[in-house]
Amino acid sequence: MRIDIMTLFPDTLGDVLCESILGRAQERGFIRIETHQIRDYTANKQNQVDDYPYGGGRGAVMTADPLYRCWEAVCDEAGGPVHTIYMSPCGHTFKQADAIRLSKMENIIIVCGHYEGIDQRFIDECVDEEISLGDFVLTGGEIAAMAVTDAVCRMVPGVLADPECFEDESHYNGLLEYPQYTRPAVWHGREIPAILTSGNHEKVRQWRRKQALRRTRERRPDMYEKLDLSSKQDKKLLKEMEAEDA
């Protein structure tokens, strides 16, 4: 998979996207992440990429031409139109399901806005979807682009050592992840749950499932309401939870 990120600040992306899991995945050829300086596609000596907004108002708006030239160059290299995402507080909220969906694409482009945003005409002509990280505003799209890139890439086959690395994680299966513990067994007087050192893998699995259900119910009731808890095992765990809470 290849992800091309269009930005005014490519240096802010490199260190994060080339380290750890993503760095190793790029070295092994599972993913490729490229950044593109939008200023390189301007047609003026000042490399100006913004102008005053029509209708007045504070700030500046990124102009469509350099964005389009950059986008066109990336698409030409890919051999055709590429699914294009604009990071925007006006977009739909990014979910784990989006990460899974996008990870199945061969190429995507992520456009990072700045200032007061980008000319709507570029969005209308070139952007396939707008994505937001949540109900807040960032100075630019770079931080959001890094988050989306990381979430998408780790879903690409081969990037993580085993599917089990993400199958138990929060949001993948509609649940928040169960609590995790490591050595020492006692820290500041707090002991780990005894079940985790029992050696009984099935009981550990059931305990983790129960903790994930409990955590989701308490912290994300909106997610909990959507769960299918009709299995015999889940019904048993729910009864145990009710007894423990009584």
Language-model features: locations:
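SAM-dependent methyltransferases
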Residues: 184-246
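N-terminal nucleotide/polyanion-binding subdomain common to many enzyme families
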Residues: 1-74, 202-225
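S-adenosyl-L-methionine/SAH cofactor-binding core of RNA-modifying enzymes
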Residues: 63-114, 120, 157
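Internal, active-site/partner-interface "lid" segment
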Residues: 143, 155-195
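Hydrophobic/aromatic beta-strand patches that form the interior of the parallel beta-sheet core
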Residues: 4-6, 34-36, 83-85, 108-109, ...
